[in-house]
Amino acid sequence: TWPEASEFCRAQGKRLPREAEWEKAARGDSGHLFPWGQQTPTPELAKFGQYLVHEIPIVAPVERGEADSSPYRLHHMAGNAAEWVEDWFGIDYYATMPDRNPRGPNSGRYKVVRGGSWKSEPVMLRTATRSGASPDRRAATIGFRCARSLH
């Protein structure tokens, strides 16, 4: 759940990244369509589109490769597990937020989830694609990464 992810990060002296931080970390300054560049996702670049019908999904480590890294050398920013971020979901986020240090709404019904998961279609792996989920949702498709401020 979002509260569990947030608490885990806080216990480590960190926090969930803000949505704008997550996107910049994924796309870099050059505006990549996907974390690794403009190339359409392939199984070598991301774990995605894996629908299981009569099997139970098993969580397992995913090997880190150089091909899937973002411009800031972060791995698995697309596919594998989608990721909770700090912000509440605002449908008009891109239209209403300032260009510098944007923040999501102060409250809402859903928290933002970024990056797509092992179950996602390729379009969900784009660096600008965003979705929302109820903060109390627990799913095998949603994980998180912690961030820390540099100053």
Regions found by a protein language model. Give the residues of each.
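Functional-site microenvironments in short loops/helix caps that host divalent-cation chemistry
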Residues: 1-131
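Short, structured beta-strand segments at or near domain termini in extracellular proteins/domains
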Residues: 139-151
